[in-house]
Amino acid sequence: MSGQGKRLMVMAGGTGGHVFPGLAVAHHLMAQGWQVRWLGTADRMEADLVPKHGIEIDFIRISGLRGKGIKALIAAPLRIFNAWRQARAIMKAYKPDVVLGMGGYVSGPGGLAAWSLGIPVVLHEQNGIAGLTNKWLAKIATKVMQAFPGAFPNAEVVGNPVRTDVLALPLPQQRLAGREGPVRVLVVGGSQGARILNQTMPQVAAKLGDSVTIWHQSGKGSQQSVEQAYAEAGQPQHKVTEFIDDMAAAYAWADVVVCRSGALTVSEIAAAGLPALFVPFQHKDRQQYWNALPLEKAGAAKIIEQSQLSVDAVANTLAGWSREILLTMAERARAASIPDATERVANEVSRAARA
């Protein structure tokens, strides 16, 4: 499907969970001849990341309202109006055929600006429960899509766009068949790390002994303290790294993952075909719990809420998963994934531009 001469503006910012799926769709459409620009904020990750992908970015001034004081709330309408006016001027100059909202504060004024100019608005909700901005924008959007069922009652479930190197991994049957020895446990805390996992997993390693080998991604600034915790638990042999640059290689190595359940993490684990033990971040709307629930229902994962988390709970769960069970769970995870999510979102963008 050629997009020669078509123009897209992607609105996404703040976190990797919004930005990386947007980049996947952008690259897919650029390969079809689309021109793509980005709308973001200058003080968040998209400011550095998006230009590295060869995409020009425009900035508006906007920030979130949650947890702000009364003065900020009083000033909010004026701030939103100014951000809308900035976005509108940018879009009048660029003249996109369609805008794609992938979440983050920038999507609110950006989506309203597009709507006020008669530009189709396509939305994608990455999480199992809709964010405030997308709830508002859904009322004016041309098309609303969701990664997991339940965020919107009638929106099409299309999955989350994930990186091509993860999608290219061999299927679980090919990858895991014939593996022997200690079960390979990948612990992923995200770029900031997950303190609860950093504190719990060294004790889990002590309980499980030689039955597991662990690769623990600790997050920025935590590698030394986590290595020390493993050593103090009598388990210095396990590998601890601050970051993992090649997640596809880490997934290929692992037999099972212990991690938070951010939207992109859940989608990548399903696409990779891996069993998981999810410990959702305690957010008031339980966003990460709802992200993980479809894989638990599919028999591909187990959720332990943070309030129920203990060394015994994690150790007993991992000890109860034989290699046969892990392979079955891995196959169920892969079966629950939507590997063509990027194409599905891109196709809806193309349809909206032609409508």
UniProtKB/Swiss-Prot annotation:
Keyword Cell wall biogenesis/degradation recorded: yes
GO cellular component terms, semicolon-separated: plasma membrane
Major enzyme class: transferase
Gene Ontology MF term list: UDP-N-acetyl-D-glucosamine:N-acetylmuramoyl-L-alanyl-D-glutamyl-meso-2,6-diaminopimelyl-D-alanyl-D-alanine-diphosphoundecaprenol 4-beta-N-acetylglucosaminlytransferase activity; undecaprenyldiphospho-muramoylpentapeptide beta-N-acetylglucosaminyltransferase activity
Biological process per Gene Ontology, one example term: lipid glycosylation
Pathway this chain belongs to: Cell wall biogenesis; peptidoglycan biosynthesis
Alphabetical list of Gene3D superfamilies matching this protein: Glycogen Phosphorylase B
Keywords: Cell cycle, Cell division, Cell inner membrane, Cell membrane, Cell shape, Cell wall biogenesis/degradation, Glycosyltransferase, Membrane, Peptidoglycan synthesis, Transferase
Localization terms from the record: Cell inner membrane
Substrates-to-products reaction catalysed: di-trans,octa-cis-undecaprenyl diphospho-N-acetyl-alpha-D-muramoyl-L-alanyl-D-glutamyl-meso-2,6-diaminopimeloyl-D-alanyl-D-alanine + UDP-N-acetyl-alpha-D-glucosamine = di-trans,octa-cis-undecaprenyl diphospho-[N-acetyl-alpha-D-glucosaminyl-(1->4)]-N-acetyl-alpha-D-muramoyl-L-alanyl-D-glutamyl-meso-2,6-diaminopimeloyl-D-alanyl-D-alanine + UDP + H(+)
Record: residues binding UDP-N-acetyl-alpha-D-glucosamine: T15, G16, G17, N127, R163, S191, I244, A263, L264, T265, V266, S267, E268, Q288
InterPro entries: GlcNAc_MurG, Glyco_trans_28_C, GlycoTrans_28_N
Keyword Cell membrane: yes
Pfam families: Glyco_tran_28_C, Glyco_transf_28
Membrane topology per record: Peripheral membrane protein
EC assignment: 2.4.1.227
Known role: Cell wall formation. Catalyzes the transfer of a GlcNAc subunit on undecaprenyl-pyrophosphoryl-MurNAc-pentapeptide (lipid intermediate I) to form undecaprenyl-pyrophosphoryl-MurNAc-(pentapeptide)GlcNAc (lipid intermediate II).
HAMAP family, sorted: MurG
Family under the similarity heading: Belongs to the glycosyltransferase 28 family. MurG subfamily.
Protein name: UDP-N-acetylglucosamine--N-acetylmuramyl-(pentapeptide) pyrophosphoryl-undecaprenol N-acetylglucosamine transferase
Lineage start: Bacteria, Pseudomonadati, Pseudomonadota, Gammaproteobacteria, Enterobacterales
Originating gene: murG
